[in-house]
Amino acid sequence: MDSTAQQFPLNHDLQVQKDQKGVVEEDEEQIHKRIRNYESHSGFSEYCTLFGHEKSVTCVSVSPNKRWIATSSSDGTIKIWSALTFRLECTLFGHYRGISQVKWATGSKYLASASDDKTIRIWDFEKRCSVRCLKGHTNYVSSIDFNPLGTLLVSGSWDETVRIWNLQDGTCLRMLPAHSEPIISVSISADGTLCATASYDGMARIWDVLSGQCLKTLVEPINVPLSNLQFTENRKYLLVSNLNSQIRLWDYRRNRVVRIFDSHVNTRYSMSWDCYSSKNIPKNTEALPNNDSSYPDDAESFMHDAYLLIPSEDGTIQITDPSTKIIIDDSIRHSDDPETSLLNVTSLGPFIITSGTDPYVRVWAPSLLLSKHEKDGFSP
């Protein structure tokens, strides 16, 4: 098996196929309407490429203060880049196998990394060194997340368990036998009270962080592995992606799906998405509304003034209006190599940052914005 658990395909004998019962069907006219680009927007252009990693870039994480970009790779390193100049600041060494994820803590001083060496490392960015190594998982650590205070960290692993760590002394407070297959993603709610987990067993679960009690189990309508999940900022919904090329917006309190995004390709990898301010792309008032009555009005506000950045394994990004599901832009293509899959997309002001199964990190900006500014004077 290759070195980064979160980013590599499942066993070849596990074939994921489309199941018509779990897919929202659309006629050809609806599809063409939904993928129509806004006429007032002229796409994105590559601003720069960040070189340095030797293998696939598994995660891109922007610091809360928007000053730094951390990238992790299956080459076992973390690189920190300036978000102002996009120049390499430092490289952090410590893991001896691939790194699946890197996350910043509140305050932008500390960050954590999850590795295939079965450990989690806490890094002091100011000192440029690892200050703690968390051991306990018995298989690849695939995902991590800090609570808002930066006092706790939750980790998910291929050993099918979730661990909750006290970062003051590095002790494991709880070990939860959470799933029957590898855990691919964990997410803590904005208020720090809930933790969500996604697994290859096709289930997402909601946990109480303090008690470790499972509060809710969300079951996909078809038996397909999950690939990622994330709480929305308003804490009301959970975005859950699966390897049937779908992202579902769950109202987990009512146990129902209120949105399905299914125009991208995701059948092999765990991929991350992000939000992108709608202020960076002019609105087209002629955009067609979504008249599908299966989507209730109470889901319209789950992303305020933002689009959803959805990566696709064909190398493109779909900038999608979450209210109408109209694809605003799909001009970004991470690589011309058909063998390279796009894995991660992250926003930084007007910039969009992409990484994939190649060793490059690419930075993109709206073409209209680039045409008005000299590159040397253009920054987030």
From Swiss-Prot:
A cellular component annotation (GO) from this entry: nucleus
Subcellular location: Nucleus
Database matches in CDD domains: WD40
Source organism, top-level taxon: Eukaryota
Main location: nucleus
WD repeat residue intervals: 52-91, 94-133, 136-177, 179-219, 221-262, 291-330, 335-374
Keywords, ordered alphabetically: Nucleus, Phosphoprotein, Repeat, WD repeat
BP terms from Gene Ontology: transcription initiation-coupled chromatin remodeling
Gene3D superfamilies hit by this protein: YVTN repeat-like/Quinoprotein amine dehydrogenase (2.130.10.10)
Residues annotated with Phosphoserine modification: S379
Entry's Gene Ontology molecular function annotations: histone binding; transcription corepressor activity
Subunit-level organization: Component of the Set1 complex composed of ash2, sdc1, set1, shg1, spp1, swd1, swd2 and swd3.
Free-text function comment from the UniProt entry: The Set1 complex specifically methylates 'Lys-4' of histone H3.
Protein name: Set1 complex component swd3
The organism of origin for this protein: Schizosaccharomyces pombe (strain 972 / ATCC 24843)
